[in-house]
A protein has these predicted regions:
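Short S/T/G/P-rich N-terminal loop/turn motif that feeds into the first structured element of a domain
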Residues: 1-52, 59-69, 92-96
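C-terminal structural segments of small proteins and small subunits
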Residues: 64-90
Length: 96
């Protein structure tokens, strides 16, 4: 069953965050992730406004978690820490 990686981000250091994004993209796609939304237009209806919103589809919740915990993604994430304020949730899709 598919799962989604949903991130809401405020970037505080664009240069460092760009390094994260470049490395993270490779790690995410290597784990079967497919970007569905990435910093496009959005409407903030409730909660905290974060200008960068990302949705990635993975083959399963386990694949999404494996990606997050992978050495490749953690190396990328080191560039995002201190360069952004982030909320990230992994959520399984409904059965078809």
């Amino acid at each position: 069953m598919a799962a989604y990686w949903i991130a809401h981000v405020t970037v505080t250091d664009p240069e460092a965050y760009a390094r994260y994004a470049g490395l993270a993209t490779g790690a995410i796609t290597a784990h079967g992730g497919k970007f569905l939304a990435r910093s496009g237009r959005y409407l903030q209806m409730e909660g905290n406004d974060r200008a960068r919103n990302v949705v990635v589809e993975f083959p399963s919740l386990e694949a999404a978690e494996e990606c997050y915990r992978s050495a490749e993604y953690q190396a990328a994430l080191a560039h995002a820490k201190g360069a952004s304020v982030r909320d990230l949730v992994l959520v399984e899709s409904l059965e078809a």
